């Protein structure tokens, strides 16, 4: 019975991988908005109805496919963090790497973190379980942070280091967290809608500047 269930799980993950990779190809070769059930099923080599055996709807499939970009981010993050001299540099380097990746793909990241995905809860964790063979060892150490689907929780977890080191008062933590997310979300939204004419480097630099000012305003 256990063997049968394992085989079913392996088969399920294999099929999901076919559809996820097909969706990723469409996003990269065409665009985010070009993804349709028909295109994905044709590219994967199955009929359209098969998709619904593994995904609730097209939105869930697209969400899974967007998570690939977090994998790329996690690999670069290891490099960005290695020269951090203190917790402040460590925190700012997390944001620097995150901004660089998300501002290159604003629609992907906005979809991942600022769109209502109630039905997709747990998708990030399931994605990394499906593609566990593709994750290198250094990236595995960052999985607890990466697996959090709520960007407020992700950032709050990182900010707690400032409280533990008596840099920020505990009572101000939630306000600071909210302020930083608003800064990032605003820049991401403006880039997504072509409301600003910033290069990725300039947008990242401005975001880091505002985050730094926010932290200093709450510093003990």
PLM regions with names:
Residues 2, 149-165, 169, 173-220:
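C-terminal peripheral helix-coil segments that are non-catalytic and often amphipathic
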Residues 36, 110-113, 121, 171, ...:
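Short, hydrophobic secondary-structure boundary micro-motifs
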Residues 79-111:
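Hydrophobic alpha-helical connector segments
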């Amino acid at each position: 019975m256990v063997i049968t269930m394992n085989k079913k799980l392996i088969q399920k993950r294999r099929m999901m991988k076919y559809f996820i990779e097909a969706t990723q190809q469409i996003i990269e070769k065409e665009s985010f908005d070009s993804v349709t059930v028909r295109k994905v099923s044709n590219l994967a080599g199955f009929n359209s109805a098969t998709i619904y055996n593994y995904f609730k709807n097209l939105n869930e499939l697209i969400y899974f496919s967007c998570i690939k970009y977090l994998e790329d981010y996690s690999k670069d993050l290891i490099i960005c963090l290695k020269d951090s001299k203190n917790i402040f540099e460590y925190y700012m380097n997390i944001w620097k790497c995150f901004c660089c990746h998300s501002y290159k793909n604003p629609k992907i990241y906005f979809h991942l973190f600022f769109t209502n995905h109630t039905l997709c809860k747990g998708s990030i964790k399931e994605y990394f379980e499906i593609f566990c063979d593709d994750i290198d060892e250094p990236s595995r150490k960052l999985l607890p942070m990466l697996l959090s689907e709520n960007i407020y929780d992700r950032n709050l977890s990182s900010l707690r280091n400032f409280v533990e080191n008596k840099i920020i008062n505990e009572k101000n933590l939630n306000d600071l967290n909210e302020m930083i997310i608003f800064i990032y979300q605003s820049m991401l939204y403006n880039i997504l809608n072509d409301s600003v004419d910033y290069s990725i480097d300039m947008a990242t630099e401005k975001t880091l500047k505002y985050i730094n000012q926010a932290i200093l305003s709450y510093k003990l």
